[in-house]
Amino acid sequence: DYGQKNPTVFEAFGVDYSRQALRGLDEWYHCGRDEGQKSPSEYAKELKDFCDRLEKEYDRVVSWVFIDPSAAGLIEEVRRIMPHIEVIPAFNDVKLGISRVQKFFSFRRILINRNQKQLIRELGLYQYDPESIKKGKEEVLKVNDHAADATRYLVCGMWGLIAVFLPVSDRE
């Protein structure tokens, strides 16, 4: 998930075919409001360094990066400095994405690593706006949601490959 004043978060997951699950690997987090803003090219360099470290640590190649579709400048910078990785603008249907992530948690098909501290923190805070619920709508509160959004982008982006980890009736 990308932000200038709001946090920029990279959530890394691997596909564990033997357990039919997404396995959390690590996280990178920077809040522009607290730590100073960075340019898209600086974030692209941070992402490259993060992916290089993951590849070395896990002896696996990073294949895909899903980036907030509103971050066109970052997408272009990442494509420029990481041409070997498929950079995909994230699917951003919030309601469907939340439903898919919930299914993965319900069926224990997503495993979080203790290094994913912001994701762990945010999952306990992620909520719908009580006022919107009173009006018969479910609108997500857009606070404390950056790591969770990054995870939602991943689940939706990989859905065609990972939906098979769920019971047939829950694959939609």
Q: Which role fits each region the language model picked out?
A:
Residues 1, 169-171:
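Short, intrinsically disordered, charge-balanced linker/junction segments flanking boundaries
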Residues 11, 18-142, 159-165, 172:
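Mg2+-dependent endonuclease catalytic cores in nucleic-acid-processing enzymes, primarily RNase H-like
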Residues 1-15:
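Gly/Thr-rich phosphate-binding beta-strand-loop-beta motif of the actin/hexokinase/Hsp70
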